[in-house]
Amino acid sequence: MRWNNHSGLEGTHAFLSASSYHWLNYTDEKLISVFKNKLAAQRGTELHDFASRCIKLKQRLPRSNKALNAFVNDAIGFNMDSEVLLYYSDICYGTADGIYFGKQRGSDRMILRIHDLKTGEIPAKMDQLMIYTALFCLEYGMKPGEMDIELRIYQGMDILFYNPKPEEILPIMDTIIRFDKIIKEVKTVEGVN
């Protein structure tokens, strides 16, 4: 048999793929809903890329009540870096949308700022940003009590602010260390790299 050539699609997955067979049971409405969610996720990725480019180029956006504009402008105003990978191990790491660590304006006290842009509809929680804070502390040998911490989530037309206490970050750091060790032990027993 001479197979048709589809080399341009290698490594990709069709929306209606055989390996994601659940669509066989979708109603038309469910199909449309799932596809729109996929489009929204793609748009979210594109918006994150756009925001990151604006921040890196120090290109402010027009003032508005949109989270994207506020996120970009605040990141530039606070001299933040965009898309910074925070690493504890190959098992635990993550990328912060916007991050800054340095002296606070008008103070000798250090501050860690982590901002996150959420483009979806599901209300966001601070847990992800608290994990980034723990990863920062672990990677750079910092103690949460040695600095001020400000976390922000930009979503829709809202900005959520949170200043976690060291007692909230320390257990996350401990969990990362413990779970990382457990996974490494399991990988050793299972002969997995």
Model-predicted segments: where are they?
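Accessory terminal regions of nucleic-acid processing enzymes
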Residues: 181-193
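Catalytic cores of nuclease domains that cleave nucleic-acid phosphodiester backbones
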Residues: 33-113, 120-127, 139-149, 159-164, ...
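Charged, glycine-rich intrinsically disordered N-terminal tails and low-complexity linkers that flank
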Residues: 1-50, 193
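Surface-exposed alpha-helical segments enriched in charged/polar residues
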Residues: 73, 134, 174-177, 181-184
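RNase H-like, two-metal
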Residues: 154-158, 177-180
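Short, well-ordered amphipathic alpha-helices
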Residues: 130-138
